[in-house]
Amino acid sequence: PPPPLAFRSRARRGLEEPGSGLVGTVVVAPDLGGSLVVVPGESPAPGTGTVRSVRVEVEAGLPVDGEVFAAAVLATLNDPRGWSVPDGVTFSRTAADDASIRVVLASPATTDRLCAPLATESRYSCGNSVTGAAVLNFERWVLGAPDFGDDLATYRQYLVNHEVGHVLGHGHEDCPAPGAVAPVMVQQSISAQGCLTNGWPVP
């Protein structure tokens, strides 16, 4: 297997931006074994509409402050630019087993196992409307994607919104025209297809 990727905490611009949850020396280990830890905590849904409860899980061994990560996930989902307007939803946080959505941060190999039969190639993430799980690949959380450059904060918001978008039933979209703002369901982890990168359903 490839050796772990390691970064000093400030080796890349944006690595420790608020909401990343990253702590200390950040090592991207290929496989941490798959033990998932539920981040404790609850918060009510702040908006109107259909309430979707969200449970946040972090794989044991990741250099992540789970509470900071969970708060960032819920802040992204409940942002006015998020899914609340187009889908009429609002998101609460729970640690209960009956959560309607699970957001999981996992090592590349664990992501592959959780996303199967979809082939994520240890590089990508997934969201599944049947299982209710949005699995975020930790390597992507740390490295971002080429078209986003150093804008890791926006990429992380994109990653949450895109994969939870799948959980909500949204499929992939294409860039409508070169230079246009990319719909959030474009596979921007691979390429923005000539569009401007965007992390939000309603930018």
Protein language model features and the residues they cover:
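Metalloprotease/metallohydrolase-associated module, dominated by Zn2+-dependent proteases
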Residues: 1, 6, 24-29, 124-146, ...
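N-terminal low-complexity, Pro/Thr-rich disordered segments
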Residues: 1-51
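Acidic/histidine-rich, surface-exposed loop or edge segments in extracytoplasmic proteins
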Residues: 48-63
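Active-site-proximal beta-strand/loop segments in catalytic clefts of secreted hydrolases
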Residues: 58-59, 105-108, 137-139, 170, ...
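Short, solvent-exposed loop/turn elements at domain surfaces
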Residues: 63-66, 112-113, 193-195
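Metzincin-family zinc-dependent endopeptidase catalytic domain
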Residues: 67, 71-155
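Structured segments of extracytoplasmic/periplasmic soluble domains
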Residues: 75-84, 167, 171, 188-191
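Active-site recognition of the HExxH zinc-binding catalytic motif
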Residues: 153-171
